[in-house]
């Protein structure tokens, strides 16, 4: 019995793609994961004209301090930030211009946290992951019929397969909260997936284990030195962040339609509060619970 899970982990570890993503900056206390959801809009998926080619539609910082609550912070992809060597632009432009390394540098500059592990999930792999666990339950109060993402929804909760889960995670334009609402749905989807993966019944289903690991590792690209055990630690940290003693949300936001120049509509983070917010996240002194969100919320 012991040989099966050990062999499965070794097999899965060998299937994960690795890239040179980390900056080599001096370590900061605690452990910081940068999670990015990349979306090439290929394979017959309805295309959003604002996201030609590969983009990061999901950018999250997961920080485990030396003491204090674990924090999962969604960084709006349209947040207006300074990108090293490029100037001010939308956060996800860093990935377009310089891939994972420039995204890591940009997030480190914004947050003051050194990224220890970079984990990129191909959005196409989300569909396979959801199907591999037999579907997930998702909830939304919105009425949606969105051609760009493919999301069709009536208010309430329901069990969905991979195609609908992917549309749920992608939809932005039909949500009054825009990028912020999408970030909340993406966190909900990841939590639902994590709950299914942690189900003890999965241990008794070797075939489903193999399908899940195959889908998961096939969808992942991680930084050099990040292995399957680090991903296990990430999953535990994510669960802690989503629990009662964790922190979830966004940095402080002051404007959802900030137009600083030739980059269109962006999200403006609060320039006065954001540095202190991330300093408190790093130190483990920010209070547990939801944080950030819509201006005035």
Per-region residue spans from a language model:
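Non-catalytic, solvent-exposed segments at the cell envelope interface
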Residues: 1-297
């Amino acid at each position: 019995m012991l040989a099966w899970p050990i062999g499965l982990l070794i097999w899965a570890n060998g299937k994960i793609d690795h890239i040179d993503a980390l900056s080599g900056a001096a370590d900061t206390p605690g452990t910081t994961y940068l999670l990015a959801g990349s979306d090439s809009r290929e394979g017959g998926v309805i295309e959003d004209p604002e996201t030609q080619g590969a983009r990061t539609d999901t950018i999250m910082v997961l920080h485990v301090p030396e003491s204090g609550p674990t924090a999962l912070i969604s960084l709006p992809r349209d947040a207006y930030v300074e990108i090293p060597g490029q100037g001010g632009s939308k956060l996800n432009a860093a990935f377009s211009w310089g891939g994972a390394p420039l995204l890591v540098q940009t997030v480190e500059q914004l947050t003051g946290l050194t990224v220890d592990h970079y984990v990129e999930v191909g959005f196409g792999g989300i569909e396979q992951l959801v199907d591999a666990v037999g579907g997930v339950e998702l909830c939304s109060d919105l009425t949606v019929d969105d051609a760009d993402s493919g999301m069709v929804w009536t208010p309430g909760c329901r069990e969905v397969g991979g195609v609908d889960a992917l549309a749920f995670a992608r939809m932005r334009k039909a949500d009054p909260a825009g990028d912020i609402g999408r970030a909340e749905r993406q966190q909900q989807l990841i939590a639902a997936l994590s709950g299914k993966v942690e189900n003890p019944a999965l241990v008794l289903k070797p075939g489903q284990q193999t399908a899940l690991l195959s889908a998961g590792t096939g969808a992942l690209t991680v930084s050099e030195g990040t292995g399957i055990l680090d991903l296990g630690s990430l999953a535990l940290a994510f669960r802690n962040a989503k629990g009662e003693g964790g922190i979830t949300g966004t940095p402080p936001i002051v404007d959802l339609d900030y137009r600083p120049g030739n980059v269109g509509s962006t999200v403006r983070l609060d320039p006065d509060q954001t540095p202190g917010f991330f300093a408190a996240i790093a130190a483990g002194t920010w209070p547990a619970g939801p944080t950030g969100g819509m201006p005035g919320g």
